[in-house]
């Protein structure tokens, strides 16, 4: 994930990680459902980029506090949120 500077590249990398989380059966269903919701939000090009990323970050922060989430998944979620935070708001 490091080194991605273009917002499209960041979105692409984040969607790959989120797809991995959504397809991981060791992750609780509510977390997988949220990952699918975030994927749908990020892929919805009818909304501005800053709105898609801020909505996604909000959902990621909510699910990262879930006590049932596996540690490896929590780390992935934090990484995705950090990457999404690098996308500039003014575009």
Curated annotation (Swiss-Prot):
A Pfam family of this chain: UPF0147
InterPro entries: Ta0600-like_sf, UPF0147
Family: Belongs to the UPF0147 family.
NCBIfam families: PRK04330.1 (NF003319)
Protein name: UPF0147 protein Mbur_0922
Organism, as annotated: Methanococcoides burtonii (strain DSM 6242 / NBRC 107633 / OCM 468 / ACE-M)
């Amino acid at each position: 994930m490091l080194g991605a500077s273009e917002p499209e590249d960041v979105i692409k990398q984040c969607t790959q990680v989120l797809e991995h989380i959504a397809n991981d059966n060791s992750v609780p269903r509510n977390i997988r459902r949220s990952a699918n919701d975030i994927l749908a939000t990020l892929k919805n090009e009818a909304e501005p980029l800053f709105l898609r990323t801020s909505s996604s970050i909000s959902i990621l922060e909510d699910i990262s506090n879930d006590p049932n989430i596996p540690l490896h998944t929590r780390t992935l979620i934090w990484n995705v949120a950090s990457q999404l935070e690098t996308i500039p708001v003014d575009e």
